[in-house]
Amino acid sequence: MQQFTVHKGLVAPMDRENVDTDAIIPKQFLKSIKKTGFGVNLFDEWRYLDHGEPGQDPASRKPNPDFVLNQPRYAGASILVARKNFGCGSSREHAPWALDQYGFRAILAPSFADIFFNNCFKNGLLPIVLPEATIDMLFNEIAAFPGYELTIDLDRQVIVRPQGEEIPFDVIAFRKFCLLNGFDDIGLTLRHADKIRAYEAERLATKPWLAHTLVQR
């Protein structure tokens, strides 16, 4: 998993409440057995005027010129500012995969759906909860200043606005540790690889019949 330490990026606004996971990545794209390739279908039903199916060439489709991420001023955005209850709906982990693979590193909103919130951390995305008044201020500044960028310093737990003012935010210490070090669940487990190997060796030496039973099954 990619580390998150300090990130500076262009900000895009998603001015809708209750954006659910089916809007983030529609159900027809969940058929893939791979974990990659979802970025091109992020917000598919809003992003394109035609219906999308897995395997379609995005270049052959009709983009919706009114959708925010299709507007030239937000091309290459890596920070998304959203409204309350972002990521509600089903618990599909494909939603943070799609956001990450599109290029987003952080999402700022007044609130998130719980499962989506946790899935973001597990996939290298930083979801930040901010007061609604702060989110309103950011929406206003994004609209007023083309090319609006923010700097997010996870170690210091601050968001730095273009003028230099800092917005503090909270993050659970364990989640912060994982993002700073790039640890997903597998990475956390592999930190103890030596102990796991030692345990398996001891078990094989003291209870060899268990290994034999497993092989027979």
From Swiss-Prot:
<keyword id="KW-0456">Lyase</keyword>
<keyword id="KW-0432">Leucine biosynthesis</keyword>
<dbReference type="InterPro" id="IPR050075">
    <property type="entry name" value="LeuD"/>
</dbReference>
<protein>
    <recommendedName>
        <fullName>3-isopropylmalate dehydratase small subunit</fullName>
        <ecNumber>4.2.1.33</ecNumber>
    </recommendedName>
</protein>
<keyword id="KW-0028">Amino-acid biosynthesis</keyword>
<comment type="function">
    <text>Catalyzes the isomerization between 2-isopropylmalate and 3-isopropylmalate, via the formation of 2-isopropylmaleate.</text>
</comment>
<comment type="subunit">
    <text>Heterodimer of LeuC and LeuD.</text>
</comment>
<dbReference type="Pfam" id="PF00694">
    <property type="entry name" value="Aconitase_C"/>
</dbReference>
<dbReference type="GO" id="GO:0009098">
    <property type="term" value="P:L-leucine biosynthetic process"/>
</dbReference>
<comment type="similarity">
    <text>Belongs to the LeuD family. LeuD type 1 subfamily.</text>
</comment>
<dbReference type="GO" id="GO:0003861">
    <property type="term" value="F:3-isopropylmalate dehydratase activity"/>
</dbReference>
<dbReference type="InterPro" id="IPR000573">
    <property type="entry name" value="AconitaseA/IPMdHydase_ssu_swvl"/>
</dbReference>
<dbReference type="InterPro" id="IPR004431">
    <property type="entry name" value="3-IsopropMal_deHydase_ssu"/>
</dbReference>
<comment type="pathway">
    <text>Amino-acid biosynthesis; L-leucine biosynthesis; L-leucine from 3-methyl-2-oxobutanoate: step 2/4.</text>
</comment>
<dbReference type="InterPro" id="IPR015928">
    <property type="entry name" value="Aconitase/3IPM_dehydase_swvl"/>
</dbReference>
<keyword id="KW-0100">Branched-chain amino acid biosynthesis</keyword>
<dbReference type="GO" id="GO:0009316">
    <property type="term" value="C:3-isopropylmalate dehydratase complex"/>
</dbReference>
<dbReference type="InterPro" id="IPR033940">
    <property type="entry name" value="IPMI_Swivel"/>
</dbReference>
